[in-house]
């Protein structure tokens, strides 16, 4: 660690001359994704970046890097509705808005809100529900802006420790906050939250910080200490290493999800709510792994 006393001249010059060269550099995210559908088939299963009923996107704009995940609510399948259509369309709309520059980096809730209302105004009714988590890195300010609705989420790791994480939003056990579009005759009887209900946060990040964004299929099956163990294997900041680590994390969560004797975070949460449950939670799993790096064109 640099000593202020030892490097007083350097610090003084930086103050006198304005921002240092390090502070003036733009940041970016080196990001990779991996996931599993609940039906055991791994990889991208449907149009766009979808793993089962989960969906995600990674988008780059000159002002920011933006990524997101959404978990389609599977209960719609009982009514003949494909849950992946809602989550997939929501994420593709968010991605398009970013690429078109129709967003403000400091306002990820705005991305979610605009995308959701585009879906509401769709001429062809799109029924369904999903959770959503949006993460934005502002290149120049080096700040991360987040919006999380429901039980998907993110965590930021620095020096092997979790320094920031999203708060899970639940109405009650296993019923997360969610965006919904219901048929007119069912409006009022389908649980639906406003994008403005998303939990928002903003904070500075540093070069080398690791950002993991995922659906509940990961967090319900892997506690933080297991995730941190996998992240220790990440030695390089290139795409290949990031992709391999994302794959390793998703694969471990997938194995644990089908272990009947494993006391998963979901099982522990169920026990805390008076239910006698043990084992992993079979679910779609989506992992986006990102490393904060210096921006290059």
From Swiss-Prot:
Gene Ontology biological process: regulation of ubiquinone biosynthetic process
Residues holding Mn(2+) 2: 71, 216
Cofactors that this protein relies on: Mg(2+); Mn(2+)
Keywords for this protein: Hydrolase, Magnesium, Manganese, Metal-binding, Mitochondrion, Protein phosphatase, Transit peptide
Transit peptide per record: 1-27
SMART domains (UniProt xref): PP2C_SIG (SM00331), PP2Cc (SM00332)
EC number: 3.1.3.16
PROSITE patterns referenced in this protein's UniProt entry, alphabetically: PPM_2
Catalysis performed (reactions): O-phospho-L-seryl-[protein] + H2O = L-seryl-[protein] + phosphate; O-phospho-L-threonyl-[protein] + H2O = L-threonyl-[protein] + phosphate
Principal EC category: hydrolase
Compartment list: Mitochondrion matrix
Disulfide bonds: none
Cofactor binding note from Swiss-Prot or TrEMBL: Binds 2 magnesium or manganese ions per subunit.
Domain of life of the source: Eukaryota
GO CC terms: mitochondrial matrix; mitochondrion
Domain spans labelled PPM-type phosphatase: 28-292
MF GO annotations: metal ion binding; protein serine/threonine phosphatase activity
Binding-site residues for Mn(2+) 1, renumbered to this chain: 71-72
Function field: Protein phosphatase which positively regulates biosynthesis of the ubiquinone, coenzyme Q. Dephosphorylates the ubiquinone biosynthesis protein coq7 which is likely to lead to its activation.
Family: Belongs to the PP2C family.
Protein name (Swiss-Prot/TrEMBL): Protein phosphatase PTC7 homolog
């Amino acid at each position: 660690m640099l000593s202020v006393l030892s490097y007083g001249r350097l610090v003084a010059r930086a103050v006198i001359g304005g921002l240092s060269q390090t502070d003036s550099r733009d940041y970016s995210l080196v990001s990779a994704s991996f996931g599993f559908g609940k039906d055991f088939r791994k990889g991208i299963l449907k149009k766009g970046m979808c793993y089962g009923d989960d969906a995600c996107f990674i988008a780059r704009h000159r002002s920011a890097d933006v990524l997101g995940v959404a978990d389609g609510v599977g209960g719609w399948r009982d009514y003949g509705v494909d849950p992946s259509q809602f989550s997939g369309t929501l994420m593709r709309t968010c991605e398009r808005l970013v690429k078109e520059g129709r967003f403000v980096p400091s306002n990820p809730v705005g991305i979610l809100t605009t995308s959701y209302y585009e879906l509401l105004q769709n001429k062809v009714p799109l029924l369904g529900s999903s959770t959503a988590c949006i993460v934005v890195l502002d290149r120049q300010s080096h700040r991360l802006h987040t919006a999380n609705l429901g039980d998907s989420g993110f965590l930021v790791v620095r020096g092997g420790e979790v320094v920031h994480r999203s708060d899970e939003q639940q109405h009650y056990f296993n019923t997360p906050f969610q965006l919904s579009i219901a048929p007119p005759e069912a409006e009022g009887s389908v649980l639906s939250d406003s994008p403005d209900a998303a939990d928002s946060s903003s904070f500075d990040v540093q070069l080398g910080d690791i950002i993991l964004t995922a659906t509940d299929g990961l967090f319900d099956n892997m506690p933080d200490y297991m995730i941190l163990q996998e992240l220790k294997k990440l030695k390089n900041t290139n795409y290949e290493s990031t992709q391999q680590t994302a794959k390793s994390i998703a694969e471990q969560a997938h194995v644990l999800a089908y272990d009947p004797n494993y006391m998963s975070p979901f099982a522990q949460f169920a026990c805390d709510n008076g239910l006698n449950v043990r084992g992993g939670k079979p679910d779609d799993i989506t992992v986006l792994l990102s490393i904060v790096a210096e921006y290059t064109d």
